[in-house]
């Protein structure tokens, strides 16, 4: 290797190195944190810790809060999701007022899921470090920012010092080349990736997604991709910023303006992996091979194309995978050898920080239009934020959903996780656009299948999983 190669860096290494505040021998480096996003579930103990030590929030202007995990999606009443939820939301209101942190509370027009509102308001910018007490913070990596989830004690540390100890991760490049077929979305791409790597394939790595199929994605598609980097075990996901990124950000509330914007873009254009940068792991996929994906098991790596058969445990050579498949099939009440298109569903959830943005809702509405939700199926659509809801209503998407028999709800995390009133009953089967199909994730005993918004809408109107490509081809 020549001298140039030893100097060349991946995008992750550039972001990491630019934020080192202090690095002592044999110590984990201390990184500066540019943005800290806060929600009601992982912050109360952190603020209590500051109060006990008499510390202020060091940079209230770099800290933004909202309530999302346990809000009701049917009313703006703070009491609607039960006592624990009410206490957490009231604590957040009190803490933000006391410590001078801006809060998008239940009645704020911009309230919504933290990972939807950050990018939407331009709080998320390329080149930043971004943390939140939430595992899906990786979403913001779509902008070429180093974004990851942290625990509650770390939330307190960032509030107090605006820094965090963070070791270097390994690097992984996932390249998706070519063009996807009709009806294939970012959700299908990322589920296909996790199907290939497995749910632990990215452990210890920061993943950079690249290739022509990734460059062709909108910012919302890239957010879906990075949102689920965590589901392959990765620390964070990244997409290098480009003209698509800059066009999305220009004019947003917290985006720079004028000369600062020009300077920002000039710097952001340098945020890409050098041509000869070395990655620890490289994974490649051909976009043309990707079909609509549906998970069959209890981790996102247990996934197949909608037209494939559910695998038999014996088909796995690894004994751990075989045992995991056996357990998953029993929990999910599925038989190997059949197709998921033969499997009936009870509920459909379109929403979450993975798939609740305007393009997601448009894709679902295109399938719902002129059709009806199947008898016996409850289908809910939960926009990711106030602005997404307002835009969808301006475009008449709410009317399409309501006419088809879907419920049109208020913004929040909703049925992605059983922390509010939207949940599965034991044994209920759900086609969900969220990111985790773990046992009990959507409610104790609930069975979750992860799909794209269009696939979720197709399941809702069919009463079972269906290949969206066949529905798209038929007239209503």
Curated annotation (Swiss-Prot):
Subunit structure: Heterodimer of LeuC and LeuD.
Function description: Catalyzes the isomerization between 2-isopropylmalate and 3-isopropylmalate, via the formation of 2-isopropylmaleate.
Pathway this chain belongs to: Amino-acid biosynthesis; L-leucine biosynthesis; L-leucine from 3-methyl-2-oxobutanoate: step 2/4
PANTHER family in the cross-refs: 3-ISOPROPYLMALATE DEHYDRATASE, HOMOACONITASE, MITOCHONDRIAL-RELATED
Gene: leuC
Chemical reaction(s) catalysed: (2R,3S)-3-isopropylmalate = (2S)-2-isopropylmalate
GO molecular function: 3-isopropylmalate dehydratase activity; 4 iron, 4 sulfur cluster binding; metal ion binding
Name under which the protein is recorded: 3-isopropylmalate dehydratase large subunit
Gene Ontology biological process terms in this record: L-leucine biosynthetic process
Cofactor note: Binds 1 [4Fe-4S] cluster per subunit.
Enzyme Commission number, as recorded: 4.2.1.33
Recorded superkingdom: Bacteria
The protein's required cofactors: [4Fe-4S] cluster
CDD domains according to UniProt: IPMI
Iron-sulfur among keywords: yes
Keywords, ordered alphabetically: 4Fe-4S, Amino-acid biosynthesis, Branched-chain amino acid biosynthesis, Iron, Iron-sulfur, Leucine biosynthesis, Lyase, Metal-binding
Binding site for [4Fe-4S] cluster: 353, 413, 416
Organism lineage: Bacteria, Pseudomonadati, Pseudomonadota, Gammaproteobacteria, Enterobacterales
InterPro entries associated with the record: 3-IsopropMal_deHydase_lsu, Acnase/IPM_dHydase_lsu_aba_1/3, Acoase/IPM_deHydtase_lsu_aba, Aconitase_4Fe-4S_BS, Aconitase_4Fe-4S_dom, IPM_dehydratase_rel_enz, IPMI_cat
